[in-house]
Swiss-Prot record:
Origin superkingdom: Eukaryota
Any one cellular-component term (Gene Ontology): cytoplasm
CDD domains recorded: metazoan_ACD (cd06526)
Recorded GO MF terms: unfolded protein binding
Name the UniProt record assigns to this protein: Heat shock protein Hsp-16.48/Hsp-16.49
Gene3D superfamilies listed in its UniProt record: 2.60.40.790
Residue pairs linked by disulfide bridges in the UniProt entry: none
Chain ranges of the sHSP domain: 35-140
Homology family: Belongs to the small heat shock protein (HSP20) family.
Pfam families hit by this protein: HSP20
Length: 143
């Protein structure tokens, strides 16, 4: 015999009530957040990829230049920042790591970086120039 349970039965209402209470206590922000509005690209900064160059700008204002490291392995650009503070009151650590795959037409030998007084890290590289050229055909008459 198949027994159907009413959605309005006492145990279902109690289960729903307990789920609401424990969920809001365990995950108060995440549960009520609008998950459709998250924009993770804001964390990257500004990326420009046009005909002449590829560039990335990051806000690293919370880091000193000596806390930053930029490495290029093939076309993989890795940007890291690690900041550690120790005091008599405790220890804190702040870090980030970004990996960006550079486009194939970027001149990897010309990648450069600079940081502004405001803490904006700019990494850029020109695009490879088209090395093909037209070769004229000269007519040589035999004597």
């Amino acid at each position: 015999m198949l027994m159907l349970r009413s959605p309005f039965s006492d145990s279902n209402v109690l289960d729903h009530f307990l789920d609401e209470i424990t969920g809001s206590v365990q995950f108060p922000y995440w549960r009520n957040a609008d998950h459709n509005s998250f924009n993770f690209s804001d964390n990257i900064g500004e990326i420009v990829n046009d005909e002449s160059k590829f560039s990335v700008q990051l806000d690293v204002s919370h880091f000193k230049p000596e806390d930053l490291k930029i490495e290029l392995d093939g076309r993989e650009l890795k940007i890291e920042g690690i900041q550690e503070k120790k005091s008599e009151h405790g220890y804190s650590k702040r870090s980030f790591s970004k990996m960006i795959l550079l486009p194939e037409d970027v001149d990897l030998t010309s990648v450069k970086s600079a940081i502004s007084n405001e803490g904006k890290l700019q990494i850029e590289a020109p695009k490879k120039t088209n090395s093909s050229r037209s070769i004229p055909i000269n007519f040589v008459a035999k004597h």
